[in-house]
Every structure is written in structure tokens, then in C-alpha cells.
Amino acid sequence: MYEKAGVALNHEPQIESFSETSPHPALGVDYGGSRIGIAATDDLGIMPHPVETIDLTHGSDGLARIRDISEMRKVKTLVVGLPLRLDGTEGDSAKKVKHYAEKLTRMLPHLTLVFVDETYSTMDASQKLHEAGKNARKQKAVIDQVAAVEILNRWMEEIA
């Protein structure tokens, strides 16, 4: 009999390597009407960092680029920001994000998809840029990436 944290187990616990059970690396996606902010965790999930902003204004839906980034970084989890209303319900923006996420899962069925409440993530990103001495209005592309970092941070706090 084995004991773990005061709980008796009738079988020897299975030991899996961290790389087999870890949801990392993960890709954070901040989907917007004209841009998508992308961020990624490192392999251990210690630190998320900005990756790029995908411009949607020229007819691209960004799906192929997200696929390429996911494959290049060997991503296991897509963390998509879901814009909920202040009362926690889903509005039109959330429905658009879910529709986009469906396309992502059809294209990348081997990845785990997770939604995270992104309420105020762009405001938080703007505040962080301001604190760093950057003019947020002049840094729209960067704001989307920092918002994606914030989405990953929230998810990492949830799974910690």
C-alpha cells in the first residue's frame, strides 16, 4: 500500500514525465475584428511572452498563421480569450470568438482548446504599456500581443 499526502492508495502511482502531462507550451489568442494578438509560454509554462500580431484587414483570417506558429512552437494548448459581459454572460463578441475557435479546432484537432475570460485584458495591457513608458495608442499591435500574454497569465493562474 502506498500513501500520498495522507491518502492510502491500493496501487503504485503511475509516474509520467512532465512533458507528457504538461499543457505547455501553450499559445494565447486575443481575437479581435481587425487583429489577433498572439503570445506563447515557454516549454515549462513559467513565462508567457508576446509573439506577434496578425493583421486581419487585408482579407486574411489568420488561421494558417496560427497553425504555423503552433506547429513551429510544438504547442499543446490553445488558450483563447473570451470576451464576457460584466455579468458573466456571452454577447455577440463572445459568439464571434467561439465561431473562430471552432475553425481553429477543426484545423488543429490535436490541440486542447481552453477559453479564458478576457474581460479587461486589453485595458490591463494598455496599463502595463503605459507603466513601461509606452504610448498605448501608438502601440495597437503591441497591445494585442500583451493582451494575449495577459490571457495566458490568467489561464496559468487557474491551472496552478
Tell me what each language-model feature is.
Residues Y2-L27, S34-A160:
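Phosphate- and other anionic-substrate recognition elements at nucleic-acid/protein interfaces
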